[in-house]
Amino acid sequence: MKTRIHKILADHGIGSRRGIELLIRQGKVLVNGKQASIGQLVNENDIFEVDGRFIKLNKKTPNNKRVLIYNKRVGEISSRKDPEHKKTIFDALPRLKSGRWVSIGRLDINTSGLILFTNDGVFANDLMHPSSSIEREYVARVHGQVTDEILKKLVNGVKLEDGLAKFTDVQSGRKGNTNQWFAMVIMEGRTREVRR
């Protein structure tokens, strides 16, 4: 049975449908040695090459979804490839027999915390999409005094360069002499949103 290339590769954890479409546009996806086209119909018996790597599809269990929780430390890079060729968290993940790990969100190099990974690109995209309404909880240390008025503004919304940002919940935690900890919940995952 023929299936669109985006779906079959996403179902086997190669990436999200949009990510696969971008790779196709960049000419980085081959089917049976020929450049793939967007919307192309394929089947699991075809030979796939993605970004210079041959991909073996698992015909028995295409929806053998795996999810992994990774505790990222400060200083680790959470993108798949680093321009300076430093190791990334993808290098520390267990090898998959087929497909690849897709991160569900990212944390910048100066942030530590849990990141989810899956081999199911559609599942990853569903979780990351704003319509999923999934809460993301962060804990941050803030230097200086944070007033109730500031906390109210954070819940009501603060205008950033890329639009309005707001926390759905902010809870104060442990206080020090010059800083205080806060637990914050947001419903989206924009770049460095909590830090900003």
Identify the residue ranges that each predicted region occupies.
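Basic, flexible Lys/Arg- and Gly-enriched helix-loop patches that mediate nucleic-acid binding at interfaces
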Residues: 1-196
